[in-house]
């Protein structure tokens, strides 16, 4: 069985004690969770369970909500795609922050807190692009507006973490991919930077003799291995006999 997506090996003991006790519902613990979010941003870790607990506290105590902390949680969730972390966090936010307000009241509330709502919706846009594997468009969108840069500024190594996640998804799908395409998907502006990332970070190989130009070769793994699969089912004679009898039975 795989490791749960919300499991965090680096979770401090005091945070674990709060999460496993009644204090997780105590509004006074919001400051502890908020400091923990700052720590996650600095040391490149992500604790989904703790972050969801903080967002739940915000849901019960709206006056305690800190927009910057929320956007940092969402930005961190982007670095662990394609896990459900981002959508789970988004679901705990006020209804008027959602990309598509359902009622006029929600739309009016959105206009009253437009900066926070705009930030949430921009991050939701980035999540959609990542989840739909539109990697080149993700980078172009991220680089298109200074607000995006501000939203991810507190997350140390944001771009590097996202590149690694994209590379993981590429490794599940491809055995070979042209360097030109991968360069766009990883937003690496030079061939030298791409080659360094591919070899040192991914441990993949480069074939510069291919007719189509430089090709990146991904080692075989259980996800990208092409294999035929034959499925069969065995039907016992008793089961088959019951089917035949039922076909001759007259309706009562």
Swiss-Prot record:
GO CC aspect terms: eukaryotic 43S preinitiation complex; eukaryotic 48S preinitiation complex; eukaryotic translation initiation factor 3 complex
GO BP: formation of cytoplasmic translation initiation complex; regulation of translational initiation
A single MF term (Gene Ontology): RNA binding
UniProt-annotated location(s): Cytoplasm
Residue ranges occupied by any PCI domain in the UniProt entry: 46-225
Matches recorded under Pfam families: CSN8_PSD8_EIF3K (PF10075)
Keywords: Cytoplasm, Initiation factor, Protein biosynthesis
Similarity remark: Belongs to the eIF-3 subunit K family.
Purpose: Component of the eukaryotic translation initiation factor 3 (eIF-3) complex, which is involved in protein synthesis of a specialized repertoire of mRNAs and, together with other initiation factors, stimulates binding of mRNA and methionyl-tRNAi to the 40S ribosome. The eIF-3 complex specifically targets and initiates translation of a subset of mRNAs involved in cell proliferation.
Subunit structure, interactors included: Component of the eukaryotic translation initiation factor 3 (eIF-3) complex.
Protein name (database record): Eukaryotic translation initiation factor 3 subunit K
Source organism: Aspergillus terreus (strain NIH 2624 / FGSC A1156)
Taxonomic placement: Eukaryota, Fungi, Dikarya, Ascomycota, Pezizomycotina
